[in-house]
């Protein structure tokens, strides 16, 4: 079947994007790699002055039989060295990125070897439905999001965001004068019917939204994941009202099976054979990218949560038309993701291969399932057993939430003036005093408003007295996690006057 080309969405580009002209120097940088050219065109330091001749690494060996967190031993270790230069391709069978190239200016889209691995990975994970898609390396999803705002948004423009969303993403938008208008969510993520209602009732004269920013899987902060059938409905709404979908997916591969409360049933499920690659791929949530027939989706992926945050390396997948202004922006801002990072990640992935990388991702699923189960077990054990305290076991990501009906607090009306956020702040400080940090949900709340404003019904909250706290099971040992949640439970028992 012949796939269509993507649509042209350049009419959504920002004034900055439309004003930016390509750097003339970047048009000739490719000639630096031509051995027939004496390159006198740019201030590129001589590679002889790079004070590193090689980079040697020990990394675990697929299929990681002892688990991905096990110490690396001689039997389960890959040792390799990446050199500054190679005489020819035969001297570089692993397709490493030479240090002389990785540490030089150029290749703002990313090093070709790494991009080729990512393209192959993308074909395995996503069912792409238009032909002119490509990938562009980034310095992680924070950089990718900041670039997206600059490519598409002017001051005063409006974007749609989940009612509670990653605070740094909201702050990035607000710092650029972009209005973040909240869309209602529930335990299954964005509610399509309410999104449609927001758009149907959009105030005439208010700027129309250009983007919908969403964290579909293991959402930060709520831990929710958008159900597949909802994604289809959301995509159709985006088509109808002509906005782009920015799919921020750092937690996509931290998907898990649903939480099983009964320990015997859980042990039975865990005793079943380990998933093979095909089963793993089939179990993954459908993506907005796989639904996209027009180039309307901009997907942001990152190695931060699957390899290490300090790599500061990720990629954007989108149409070549949309990626072009990103490249022009990066040529004048980040130049390129760090060369050492690209060398290290590419060398590891090329030796693992696509199958080995899937083995790693399967290992992550196993580890995070254990961590999630530990957290939810402790919450059910130590939190008050009351309808006022709701736990939503996540099926992906690093976060859980405890939803609390503030109105049941005995001093809600007197001490806290019926203000749920006064109680939230008080509880936050009480929990910290007990030596535990969980984060108030209000820190992630989007409260942007357009001018003229949107109708009141578009901003209604189902129960304004519900507050929540976000915790993570990613950062500490099971023992510390359990103790921390016990202290959280003790605080709630005491503050709400509930006897154990």
Curated annotation (Swiss-Prot):
<keyword id="KW-0963">Cytoplasm</keyword>
<dbReference type="GO" id="GO:0009094">
    <property type="term" value="P:L-phenylalanine biosynthetic process"/>
</dbReference>
<dbReference type="GO" id="GO:0009072">
    <property type="term" value="P:aromatic amino acid metabolic process"/>
</dbReference>
<comment type="similarity">
    <text>Belongs to the class-I pyridoxal-phosphate-dependent aminotransferase family.</text>
</comment>
<keyword id="KW-0663">Pyridoxal phosphate</keyword>
<dbReference type="Pfam" id="PF00155">
    <property type="entry name" value="Aminotran_1_2"/>
</dbReference>
<keyword id="KW-0032">Aminotransferase</keyword>
<dbReference type="InterPro" id="IPR004839">
    <property type="entry name" value="Aminotransferase_I/II_large"/>
</dbReference>
<dbReference type="GO" id="GO:0019878">
    <property type="term" value="P:lysine biosynthetic process via aminoadipic acid"/>
</dbReference>
<protein>
    <recommendedName>
        <fullName>Aromatic/aminoadipate aminotransferase 1</fullName>
        <ecNumber>2.6.1.39</ecNumber>
        <ecNumber>2.6.1.57</ecNumber>
    </recommendedName>
</protein>
<comment type="pathway">
    <text>Amino-acid biosynthesis; L-phenylalanine biosynthesis; L-phenylalanine from phenylpyruvate (ArAT route): step 1/1.</text>
</comment>
<dbReference type="GO" id="GO:0005737">
    <property type="term" value="C:cytoplasm"/>
</dbReference>
<comment type="pathway">
    <text>Amino-acid biosynthesis; L-tyrosine biosynthesis; L-tyrosine from (4-hydroxyphenyl)pyruvate: step 1/1.</text>
</comment>
<keyword id="KW-0597">Phosphoprotein</keyword>
<dbReference type="GO" id="GO:0047536">
    <property type="term" value="F:2-aminoadipate transaminase activity"/>
</dbReference>
<keyword id="KW-0808">Transferase</keyword>
<dbReference type="GO" id="GO:0009074">
    <property type="term" value="P:aromatic amino acid family catabolic process"/>
</dbReference>
<feature type="modified residue" description="Phosphoserine">
    <location>
        <position position="100"/>
    </location>
</feature>
<dbReference type="InterPro" id="IPR050859">
    <property type="entry name" value="Class-I_PLP-dep_aminotransf"/>
</dbReference>
<dbReference type="GO" id="GO:0030170">
    <property type="term" value="F:pyridoxal phosphate binding"/>
</dbReference>
<dbReference type="GO" id="GO:0019509">
    <property type="term" value="P:L-methionine salvage from methylthioadenosine"/>
</dbReference>
<dbReference type="GO" id="GO:0006571">
    <property type="term" value="P:tyrosine biosynthetic process"/>
</dbReference>
<dbReference type="InterPro" id="IPR015424">
    <property type="entry name" value="PyrdxlP-dep_Trfase"/>
</dbReference>
<dbReference type="InterPro" id="IPR015421">
    <property type="entry name" value="PyrdxlP-dep_Trfase_major"/>
</dbReference>
<dbReference type="GO" id="GO:0008793">
    <property type="term" value="F:aromatic-amino-acid transaminase activity"/>
</dbReference>
<comment type="function">
    <text>General aromatic amino acid transaminase involved in several otherwise unrelated metabolic pathways. Responsible for phenylalanine and tyrosine biosynthesis. Active with glutamate, phenylalanine, tyrosine and tryptophan as amino donors and with phenylpyruvate, hydroxyphenylpyruvate, 2-oxoglutarate and pyruvate as amino acceptors. Also active with methionine, alpha-aminoadipate and leucine as amino donors when phenylpyruvate is the amino acceptor and in the reverse reactions with the corresponding oxo acids and phenylalanine as amino donor.</text>
</comment>
């Amino acid at each position: 079947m012949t796939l269509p080309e993507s649509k042209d969405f350049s009419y959504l580009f920002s004034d900055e994007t439309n004003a930016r002209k390509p750097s003339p120097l970047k048009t000739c940088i490719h000639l630096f790699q031509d051995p027939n050219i004496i390159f006198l065109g740019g201030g590129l330091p001589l590679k002889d002055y790079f004070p590193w001749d090689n980079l040697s690494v020990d990394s675990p060996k697929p299929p990681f039989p002892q688990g991905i967190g096990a110490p690396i031993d001689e039997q389960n270790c890959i040792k390799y060295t990446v050199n500054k230069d190679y005489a020819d391709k035969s001297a570089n069978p692993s397709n490493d990125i030479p240090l002389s190239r990785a540490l030089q200016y150029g290749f703002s889209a990313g090093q070709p070897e790494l991009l080729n691995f990512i393209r192959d990975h993308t074909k395995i994970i996503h069912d792409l439905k238009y032909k002119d898609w490509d990938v562009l390396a980034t310095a992680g999803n924070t950089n990718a999001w900041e670039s997206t705002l600059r490519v598409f948004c002017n001051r005063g423009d409006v974007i749609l965001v989940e009612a509670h969303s990653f605070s740094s993403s909201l702050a990035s938008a607000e710092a650029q004068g972009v209005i973040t208008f909240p869309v209602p969510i529930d335990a299954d993520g964005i509610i399509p019917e309410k999104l449609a209602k927001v758009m149907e009732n959009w105030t005439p004269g208010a700027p129309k939204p250009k983007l919908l920013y969403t964290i579909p899987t293991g959402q930060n902060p709520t831990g929710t994941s958008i159900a597949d059938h909802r994604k289809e409905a959301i995509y159709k709404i985006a088509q109808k009202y002509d906005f782009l979908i920015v799919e921020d997916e750092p937690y996509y591969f931290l998907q898990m099976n649903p939480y099983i409360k009964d320990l015997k049933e859980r042990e039975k499920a865990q005793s079943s054979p380990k998933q093979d690659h095909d089963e793993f791929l089939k179990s993954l949530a459908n993506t907005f990218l796989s639904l996209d027939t027009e180039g309307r989706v901009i997907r942001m992926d990152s190695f931060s949560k699957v390899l290490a945050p300090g790599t500061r390396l990720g990629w954007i997948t989108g149409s070549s038309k949309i990626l072009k202004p990103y490249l022009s922006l990066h040529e004048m801002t980040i130049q390129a993701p760090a060369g050492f990072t690209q060398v290290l990640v590419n060398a590891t992935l090329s030796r693992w291969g696509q199958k080995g990388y899937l083995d790693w991702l399967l290992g992550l699923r196993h580890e995070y399932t254990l961590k999630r189960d530990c957290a939810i077990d402790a919450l059910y054990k130590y939190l008050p057993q009351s309808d006022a305290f709701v736990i939503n076991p996540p099926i992906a990501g690093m976060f859980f939430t405890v939803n609390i009906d503030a109105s049941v607090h005995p001093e809600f009306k007197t001490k806290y003036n019926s203000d749920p956020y006064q109680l939230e702040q008080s509880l936050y400080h009480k929990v910290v005093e007990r030596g535990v940090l969980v984060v108030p949900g209000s820190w992630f709340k989007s409260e942007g408003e357009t001018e003229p404003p949107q109708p009141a019904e578009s901003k209604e909250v189902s129960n304004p007295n519900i507050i929540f706290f976000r915790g993570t099971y990613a950062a500490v040992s099971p023992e510390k996690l359990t103790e921390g949640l016990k202290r959280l439970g003790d605080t709630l028992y005491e503050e709400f006057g509930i006897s154990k």
